[in-house]
Amino acid sequence: MKFLDQCKIYIRSGNGGGGSVSFRREKYIEYGGPDGGDGGRGGDVWIEAVEGLNTLIDYRYQQHFKAGTGVHGMGRARHGAAGEDVVLKVPVGTEVLEEDKETLIADLDHAGMRLLLAKGGNGGWGNLHFKGPVNQAPKYANPGQEGEERWIWLRLKLIADVGLVGLPNAGKSTFLAAASAAKPKIADYPFTTLTPNLGVVDLSSSERFVLADIPGLIEGASEGAGLGTRFLGHVERSATLIHLIDATQDDVAGAYETIRGELEAYGDELADKAEILALNKIDALDEETLAEKVAELEAVSGIKPRLVSGVSGQGVTELLRAAYKQVRIRRGDLEEEIDDDEDHVDETPGGWTP
């Protein structure tokens, strides 16, 4: 299934049906009174977050959605039926924004959440409503009210407990494959990952969380370089970030500073989120070179990096357990405390909430 995380759509609620101008006509009743029924109300446009979806791809092929028009009223005081509603099904984590793409209308962050986007027009009154002592045979009725129309943006931010960030070719997809049953595309060239991948990490039967791998960032991504920072929105909701750095590259300190700079440029307090720093691909280095890389990275970050290898699996479980601890803190299952992991985790979340 192709991945699409934002789209612009047009919605319009239904017009109300017009009221009827009608008079009672029966045998032996020469002057029957008015009996025009009311028009039905127009259909509404709703949006609902549902489970089982992780893309907005359906809205690439259809961008216009119109609810049904109310049926006109009829004689014998028969009211028109209401127009059919339109319900837009979207993944959990979808944000609804105004046409300016900045004003947030709603954040559908849990399954079953439902929002009225456009209310249908009321049906018009039939002439039965206008009968009075002065005018006992009104020959007019109300037309139905117009429906509402608007353009809106849908933006998906995946619901993940832990986010993977790093430069292209840092080994994020390999790590995701080693940590979960996900099967992301893996190759030895930059930007192999073009869309976010999700994997469920099962530490035990009762310990599990969702891990998100997003496309790699490069210097200048906040200004549009590479794939930009668009996909960072998918880790905004996460409890912590795992920052993977390729231990085989020459400048590990520069790699760290590049990603930190892009996180700060993105905003939304993403740079203040708890971070676990890890040196990946350690199986490709000898002990002396690895020690130099660790010292270099610790000097610039102030954090003692964890050592992992997505290929051999070394250190992966320990890193995942450290990440799960942050998830439990976020869920309220565990109080934040300083322990032996304090050198590995930068815990400065700054009260961030989604």
Curated annotation (Swiss-Prot):
Disulfide bonds: none
InterPro entries: G_OBG, GTP-bd, GTP-bd_Obg/CgtA, GTP1-OBG_CS, GTP1_OBG_dom, GTP1_OBG_dom_sf, OBG_GTPase, P-loop_NTPase
Acidic residues bias (residue ranges): 335-345
Principal cellular location given in the protein's record: cytoplasm
Gene inactivation effect: Essential for growth, it cannot be disrupted. As protein levels decrease translating ribosomes, but not individual subunits, also decrease.
Alphabetical keyword list: Cytoplasm, GTP-binding, Hydrolase, Magnesium, Metal-binding, Nucleotide-binding
Positions of the UniProt region annotated as Disordered: 335-354
Limits of the Obg domain: 1-159
Binding site for Mg(2+): 173, 193
Outcome of mutating residue 168 to G: Grows like wild-type at 30 degrees Celsius
Every OBG-type G domain range: 160-328
Outcome of mutating residue 280 to K/Y: Grows poorly at 30 degrees Celsius
Consequence when changing residue 168 to R: Grows poorly at 30 degrees Celsius, slightly cold-sensitive
GO molecular function: GTP binding; GTPase activity; magnesium ion binding
Highest taxon, organism lineage: Bacteria
Enzyme's top EC category: hydrolase
Entry cofactors: Mg(2+)
Entry keyword Magnesium: yes
UniProt cross-references to NCBIfam families, sorted A to Z: Obg_CgtA, PRK12297.1, PRK12299.1
Subunit organization: Monomer.
Other facts noted in the record for this chain: Site-specific mutations that are activating (168-Val) or dominant negative (173-Asn or 280-Tyr) in ras-like proteins do not have the same phenotype in this protein family.
Protein name: GTPase Obg/CgtA
